[in-house]
Amino acid sequence: NEYILEQTKTLTENKCLILINPNMDKNYIEGLLLKNNIKGFKPYRFYSKTKDTINCKILDFITEEQIEIADKFGLIIMMHLAKKDAIADDDNINDLIYLSDKYPNVKWILAHCARSYSAWALEKGIKKIRDLKNIWYDCSTVCESDSIDALYQGVGLEKIMYGSDDMIGRMRGKYITFGKAWSAINSDNHNLALSHCDDRMTFIRYEQLRAMKRGIRNSKITESEKQDLFYNNAKNLIDSVDSRN
């Protein structure tokens, strides 16, 4: 967090989220908010109190006390859902409904199309939360056009944002899906026989952009909606937060 805050201190156009874990003190968090231009929190499942990073629930890796702070200041909480079924998991659905209702000032971002690299989870689960007013989604590193199209169709473009995932997006490879599974493939982790074709891999970010383009083509959206998807939706969401008020 100190590094992120230092990088955004002098450039007012740069905004940041701070990393949160369940053990962080309330007074420490509020002190950071009052002194810095912080737009929200980023909890992560690897900090789960249960030590189970696969099947943990939302409140295992961020506490309600911390969510209360986000609600008080109207902050963003950007989150990677856990559990194998992601947004199709009943625990995740029920928790999002509960938290969205109890903390209406929190602006939730469900990263990676609600961590649904494959379309089936969105097709199964998104209809149960699509009417929640304070949930947004980003498309970062999702490389399947069917998944992105399912999100476009499921929640409407006004709640969706492009995300670059700067650490992963610059790597060469692709997130692939089969059945209910998904994984990142790169030149070092497969033994596919590819002598019959050009086996060079492009950047994951390019694969994501290609999937977004195909999803847009399928949805027949306007030029103005494209601008919203790639810029305006995110800017409007970020501009709606002032943690120091």
Language-model features, listed with the residues they occupy:
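Distinct, well-ordered alpha-helical segments
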Residues: 1-6, 26-34, 54-56, 86-103, ...
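Residues that cap or flank secondary-structure elements
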Residues: 57-58, 87-88, 140, 204
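H/E-rich (His + Asp/Glu) clusters that bind or coordinate divalent metals
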Residues: 113-245
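Active-site gating/metal-coordination segments in enzymes
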Residues: 1-85, 131, 135
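Internal, well-ordered alpha-helical segments in soluble enzyme and binding-protein domains
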Residues: 62-66, 92-95, 106
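Active-site acidic short loop of glycosyltransferases
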Residues: 72, 104-105, 157, 232
